[in-house]
Amino acid sequence: MTAFLFDTNPNESIKLGLIVLSSDETIEDEFRAMLPKSCSLFHTRIHSAPEVTPDTLMEMKVGLAASAAMIPHSFNLDVVGYACTSGATMIGPKNVATEVQNVHPNSQVCTPITAVMRALNKLGAKKIGMVTPYIPDVSQEMRNLLIENGFEISALVSFEVSTEAIVARITADAIKRAVRAAAVDGADAVFVSCTNLRTVDVIDELEDELGIAIVTSNQALAWDMLTSAGISTAQSAVPGRLSKT
């Protein structure tokens, strides 16, 4: 067969790129469940240590551009997300954007921590309960960043785990108990951090039970990438009050 038809532009959908940690077992499934069919999702991986510490998180900065480059510039990505809440906190969201835009200069860049702050502001939530899986040094840096950006942290509940393989196996029941413990002192919302925590399926249940917004890393990142690309989350399966605000 020497002649055949082909499309000159086979993919006219919104194109999202996602830089996933090599140790993450969760975010890809949760993203697929949330994104509308009008979006194409392209994944790449970045080397990450199996143990989450301030030093190992900072080490990822040098690999961001190379990881982003595994998705060709010719794909013309609308938005690129760096899928690590703690990594973006330690490296700095602006530094993440600089590294990614060295490769994809015309793409917007989102991180979970900036997405969470935008989501909380969209919800009008200022008094926040936090749930993290991290060791204290990492949780404290994230807490400080939120405070610097005008949020009050009413409670911080952590599993205090440094091993990613364990984080990915924390049960839904354990996460729900932690959220309930953080939803105290008149919190406007609870923020559940980490892209490797399985959270998307518990958001609606917890919001109904507690009567406040639940914002998670994967939910907020999907919402932020979609809205940055001009896609209404009403077209998506992003859960919670966030998608209805």
List the predicted regions and their residue ranges:
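N-terminal glycine-rich anion-binding loop in soluble enzyme alpha/beta folds
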Residues: 1-67, 131-168
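Short, small-residue-enriched loops and turns at beta-alpha junctions
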Residues: 50, 85-90, 163-169, 198
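A short, acidic, amphipathic alpha-helical segment used as a generic capping/interface helix at domain edges
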Residues: 66-71, 171-184
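Glycine/small-residue-rich loop that forms an oxyanion/phosphate-binding "nest" at active or ligand-binding sites
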Residues: 67-114
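Periplasmic-binding protein-like
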Residues: 78-83, 129-130, 187-194
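Short, acidic/small-residue loops that bind anionic groups at enzyme active sites
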Residues: 97-120, 206-225
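Hydrophobic alpha-helical
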Residues: 177-206, 221-222
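C-terminal functional extensions of proteins
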Residues: 215-245
